[in-house]
Amino acid sequence: MDQAQHVHFVGIGGYGMSAIARVLIDLGYKVTGSDVAMNDLAKKLEARGAVIHIGHNAAHVEGADSIVYSTSISKDNPEVIAGQALGIPVMHRSQMLARILNERTGVAVAGAHGKTTTTSMISHVLEECGVDPTFIIGGELMSAGTNAKAGTSDYVIAEADESDGSFLEYRPMYEIVTSIEPDHLEHFDGDFNNLKQAYVQFLSHLKPDGKAILCIDDSHVREVMPSVEKTVVTYAVDPNFVAQAQFSATSIECGDRCSTCQVYHKDERLGELCLVVPGKHNIANALAAIVVCLDIGLSFDKIAQALSTFSGAKRRFQIIGDARGVLVVDDYAHHPTEIIATLSGARASGRRVIAVFQPQRYTRTYFLMDEFSRAFAEADEVIITDIYSPAGEEKIEGVTSEVLVQKIRTNSHPRAQYIPTKEQMQEHVFKELQEGDLVLTMGAGDIWKSAYWLAEKLEK
């Protein structure tokens, strides 16, 4: 990286921005930043020496050698404008991450689903096996208590965000694609083919001896695979595709809070894998981690042992409370495929599943309305709250939670309910709870607060 000593982050409180800021602090850089409010991530950075400003002001960038902004920051932000006027290099978050990732042995994890968990699994295994990686995660690695760290080894593990095409900045040694879905299409002219082509470009940016690690359970991954000109390593958990995959999992058993399987490399049985994070989708995520860690030089036995202690990433089927016989779980699932996978994991518990979903963004709800309406069949009870939308997003006529509930009733769950506010929903759910229930809150907004409210109420 360039030896710019003072880096200022505009919008420092997000997971992606705060992770990069944390790594730079660990590397000895002076870090300042601003955001509209102070949150836990910003407080942790402040405790490590960062100077955090609340609100955006041109004066905040004085003395900075570089300015980093996130996708959510508008072009007319006063700090961005001031930086440009002063001749300070101004770059997108992905460009700063590329500086960290591209100069070392990088592992970039992309895909519509499973990025955070897969990145976390690889980071956890390397940590447990003494490799000491740098990791930059879009969520908190529970075992480390942080979303980022600068390690002493040459390995950098990071999420590669496809949502705005910024993953094209990276030149890693390993690229993982867990899945491809028609999400974030507002950044791709509403055309899914443009997004798929972006993945092909991403996979062409590997280092010359790099490897593309692809989940062939996913039909869209299989579709783009013939266009990949780099070395390809495939993995699968779907019985329809395990015979075609180089790495596979069979004899899968998913229980209340664990999953087990047998792992194979082609026809060779590598051994048994036991995870304390439930769901078949987590076995797929673990397979991707196994492929990378084996290639790095770790033995399967060491990898499996490390994965057996992986407790998960924050907001990824995270158990918030367990009281009065009721399990309260929160998950970041905000896409139909993620909802289906998360509900499948919940269903394996054998409990009555009460699913509470807070849609996020009018654009996503518009593009995926039909898919959302078909995603809730595995739940016993379904409650939909109002759409959570970031500031500045315009409403779309006809795109409401009421409309979504009507479609869910037709396509996957006839008893789906619309309860507008979190407060109303919380009181309703609490009154309906029975011993043996599993309450599952899902969404990318602030629905997680309801999980904590319910857990605290149950413990009183």
Curated annotation (Swiss-Prot):
Species for this entry: Brevibacillus brevis (strain 47 / JCM 6285 / NBRC 100599)
Domain of life: Bacteria
Similarity annotation: Belongs to the MurCDEF family.
Binding site for ATP: G111, A112, H113, G114, K115, T116, T117
Molecular functions (GO terms): ATP binding; UDP-N-acetylmuramate-L-alanine ligase activity
A Gene Ontology term for the protein's cellular component: cytoplasm
Matches recorded under NCBIfam families: murC
Name of the protein in its database record: UDP-N-acetylmuramate--L-alanine ligase
Known EC number: 6.3.2.8
Reaction(s) this enzyme catalyzes, per UniProt: UDP-N-acetyl-alpha-D-muramate + L-alanine + ATP = UDP-N-acetyl-alpha-D-muramoyl-L-alanine + ADP + phosphate + H(+)
InterPro entries listed in its UniProt record: Mur-like_cat_sf (IPR036565), Mur_ligase_C (IPR004101), Mur_ligase_C_dom_sf (IPR036615), Mur_ligase_cen (IPR013221), Mur_ligase_N (IPR000713), MurCDEF_pg_biosynth (IPR050061), UDP-N-AcMur_Ala_ligase_MurC (IPR005758)
Pathway note: Cell wall biogenesis; peptidoglycan biosynthesis
Function: Cell wall formation.
GO BP: cell division; cell wall organization; peptidoglycan biosynthetic process; regulation of cell shape
Main location: cytoplasm
Cross-referenced Gene3D superfamilies: Mur ligase, C-terminal domain (3.90.190.20), Mur-like, catalytic domain (3.40.1190.10), NAD(P)-binding Rossmann-like Domain (3.40.50.720)
Keyword Cell division: yes
